[in-house]
């Protein structure tokens, strides 16, 4: 926690300074590399961690070293992770995917925006100072066309996005030659298909089957292609967004960039305060990762926060507004049906989902079926025209472990499975949202139910939190559940920050949540046996055993914290080469003792071997040369 709390003015000024001085930057002793594909423009970024050599012998004057291979790792930071790229937030990022989108020839530019709300915002001169300065003319599918990655996959087309993803998911592990680094324990994948090498055809096949999605709105060409599916690396989502009482456009852009730096695979903008439209435009134009939203939040703002006043027309206009800005996936709470609401009456914590409670209130006040459910096919038509993926929301998720796995939760899940099939009729990509608060022994059932009733569509969960007693530490309570459900097959984990249940997260909270969830996702990849997942662990263990402190810091998920903790007790430079740390000191370091035992054993082996040879020499008569038949 910070020693002094900044005022709102200071927070905004700090965020503005961050944006004004933003430059591409790499982590310590890392460099950005690119691996090219066969499609034009496919140039996949990765971070390569440079390592120091290992001392293997020689003398103090002439030491002998063995080189250690650089370790390539998945990188979500986009242009912000490349020191060679000039960053200008006012202009936005380069439109990486635009040539691919245009080459397909199935989209057209819109001369007039489809959303009445967007038209009104653009006509309001009072918003000029807040508006993103760059111009992006939105596109939509030509009449009679669908422009989704699912549509292309079903037609047997391998898109540049699919090739980009295949290269990215392999994480450059073909560059690693060391058998020590390539060693990996067998995983337990619970039925997942994990090929030794991920090909573009495998990506296409998984998307075509609905087991994976590529969130990639045609109006968000700045995004770098990524995939969400249980047969790929487990992904992590970060939530950002302003509220009625805190945060600004500058702060949200800062949080976006910060999130991608610390490993967010996607970011959800959950803004509920002022200038939602303008904030989202700044975020999208500067985001290298897919952006998701919950459209019902903004729709509610348009009717002054009165749930009963929501209409399909207002919601539809909001979908068009956001789709034409470039939102990559919508959370839609279409499974909160009128008949399910009474099932929550006996719950300890009722309906805790904001979107779920909004729709439940609307259903009860009108005594009508959820209009999102009633108009679901129209929602799919909109999504198919822009390639917006659907994240079917779990509006009836449990908000306490007492309410876990109850009738309401699974009734909604079964309905989401029915809606998945409808979305697939329109070639719309779908993932399913899950809980929530679930004790450890009840977590796996959530995964098996989802796979069975939602036809193996990717699962996307908030945690789940495994206990309710730790406000302020819910990134820990949920990280436990996230690691478990990721192992069981969950495709993406929505992070939880230390502020969960307490307040809106700040920049440091975002980092803490992401680091916790990157650990959970990586632990799940190891447990599943994802090919190459153990390389970084092996490199870290080797560096640790060899007391290569700088390499240990640089291989860490958070090099800065690792270095800071070490330097609290051994700040001098000599501490970076010492064969011990402050935990045990020089006399009790287990790894130093292990090295001494190993050296002693090797020396003993040599000594015993020499004694054996001496005895053999004497037994043969002590002759230096033997006749050939005696040798």
From Swiss-Prot:
Family membership noted in the UniProt record = Belongs to the ThiC family.
- The entry's [4Fe-4S] cluster-binding residues are 581, 584, 589
Q: Name one GO cellular component term.
A: cytosol
Fetch the HAMAP family from UniProt: ThiC
Question: What is the required cofactor set for this protein?
Answer: [4Fe-4S] cluster
Q: Which reaction does it catalyse?
A: 5-amino-1-(5-phospho-beta-D-ribosyl)imidazole + S-adenosyl-L-methionine = 4-amino-2-methyl-5-(phosphooxymethyl)pyrimidine + CO + 5'-deoxyadenosine + formate + L-methionine + 3 H(+)
What lineage is this protein's organism placed in? Answer: Bacteria, Pseudomonadati, Pseudomonadota, Gammaproteobacteria, Enterobacterales
Q: Which organism is it from?
A: Escherichia coli O6:K15:H31 (strain 536 / UPEC)
Please give the function described in this protein's UniProt entry. Catalyzes the synthesis of the hydroxymethylpyrimidine phosphate (HMP-P) moiety of thiamine from aminoimidazole ribotide (AIR) in a radical S-adenosyl-L-methionine (SAM)-dependent reaction.
Do the record's keywords include Nucleotide-binding?
no
The pathway that the record names for this protein is: Cofactor biosynthesis; thiamine diphosphate biosynthesis
List the molecular function annotations (GO) for this entry: 4 iron, 4 sulfur cluster binding; carbon-carbon lyase activity; zinc ion binding
Q: Which Pfam families match?
A: ThiC-associated (PF13667), ThiC_Rad_SAM (PF01964)
Q: Which NCBIfam families match?
A: PRK09284.1, PRK13352.1, thiC
Which positions bind Zn(2+)?
A: 437, 501
Query: Under which name does UniProt file this protein?
Result: Phosphomethylpyrimidine synthase
């Amino acid at each position: 926690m910070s020693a002094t709390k900044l005022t709102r003015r200071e927070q905004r000024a700090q965020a503005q300074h961050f944006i004004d001085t933003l430059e591409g930057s790499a982590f310590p002793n890392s460099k950005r590399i690119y691996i090219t594909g066969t499609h034009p423009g496919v140039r996949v970024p990765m971070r390569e961690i440079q390592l120091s050599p290992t001392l293997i012998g020689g003398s103090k004057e002439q030491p002998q070293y063995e080189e250690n291979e650089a370790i390539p790792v998945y990188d979500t930071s986009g242009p912000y992770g490349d020191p060679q790229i000039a960053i200008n937030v006012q202009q936005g990022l380069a439109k990486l995917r635009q040539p691919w989108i245009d080459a397909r020839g199935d989209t057209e530019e819109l001369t007039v925006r489809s959303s009445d709300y967007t038209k009104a915002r653009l006509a309001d001169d009072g918003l000029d100072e807040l508006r993103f300065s760059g111009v992006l003319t939105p596109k939509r599918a030509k009449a009679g066309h669908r422009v989704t990655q699912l549509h292309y996959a079903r037609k047997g087309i391998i898109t540049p996005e699919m090739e980009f993803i295949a290269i990215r998911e392999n994480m450059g592990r073909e560059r690693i030659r060391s058998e020590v680094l390539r060693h990996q324990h067998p995983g337990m994948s619970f039925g997942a298909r994990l090929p030794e090498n991920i090909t573009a055809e495998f990506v296409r096949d998984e998307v075509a089957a609905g087991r994976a999605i590529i969130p990639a709105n045609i109006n968000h060409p700045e995004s770098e292609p990524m995939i969400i599916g249980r047969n790929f690396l487990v992904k992590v989502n970060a939530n950002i967004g302003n509220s009625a009482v805190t945060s600004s456009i500058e702060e949200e852009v800062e949080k976006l960039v910060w999130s991608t730096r610390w490993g967010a695979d996607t970011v959800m903008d959950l803004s509920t305060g002022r200038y939602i439209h303008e904030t989202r435009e700044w975020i999208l134009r500067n985001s290298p990762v897919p952006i998701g939203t919950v459209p019902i939040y903004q729709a509610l703002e348009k009717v002054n926060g009165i749930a009963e006043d929501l209409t399909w027309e207002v919601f539809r206009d909001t979908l068009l507004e956001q789709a034409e800005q470039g939102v990559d996936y919508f959370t839609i709470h279409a499974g909160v049906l009128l008949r399910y609401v009474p099932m929550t009456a006996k719950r300890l914590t009722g309906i805790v989902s904001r979107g779920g409670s909004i729709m439940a209130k609307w259903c009860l006040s009108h005594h009508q079926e959820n209009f999102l459910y009633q108009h679901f096919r129209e929602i799919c038509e909109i999504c198919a025209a822009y390639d917006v993926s659907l994240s079917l929301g779990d509006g009836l998720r449990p908000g306490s472990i007492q309410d876990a796995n109850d009738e309401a939760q699974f009734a909604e899940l079964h309905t989401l499975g029915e809606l998945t099939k409808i979305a697939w009729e329109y070639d719309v990509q779908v993932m399913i949202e899950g809980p929530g608060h679930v004790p450890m022994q009840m977590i796996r059932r959530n995964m098996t139910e989802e796979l069975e009733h939602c036809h193996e569509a990717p699962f996307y969960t908030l945690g789940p939190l495994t206990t309710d007693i730790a406000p302020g530490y819910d990134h820990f309570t949920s990280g436990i559940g996230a690691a478990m459900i990721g192992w069981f097959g969950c495709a993406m984990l929505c992070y939880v920050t230390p502020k969960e249940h307490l307040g809106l997260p700040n920049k440091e909270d975002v980092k803490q949540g992401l680091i916790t969830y990157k650990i959970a996702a990586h632990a799940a990849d190891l447990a599943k046996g994802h090919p190459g997942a153990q390389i970084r662990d092996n490199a870290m263990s080797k560096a640790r055993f060899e007391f290569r402190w700088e390499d240990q810091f640089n291989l860490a998920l958070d090099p800065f914290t690792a270095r800071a903790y070490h330097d609290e007790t051994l700040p001098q430079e000599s501490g970076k080469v010492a064969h011990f740390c402050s935990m045990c000191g020089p006399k009790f370091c287990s790894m130093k003792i292990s090295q001494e035992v190993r050296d002693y054993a090797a020396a003993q082996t040599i000594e015993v071997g020499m004694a054996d040879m001496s005895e053999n020499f004497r037994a043969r008569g002590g002759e230096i040369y033997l006749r050939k038949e005696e040798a």
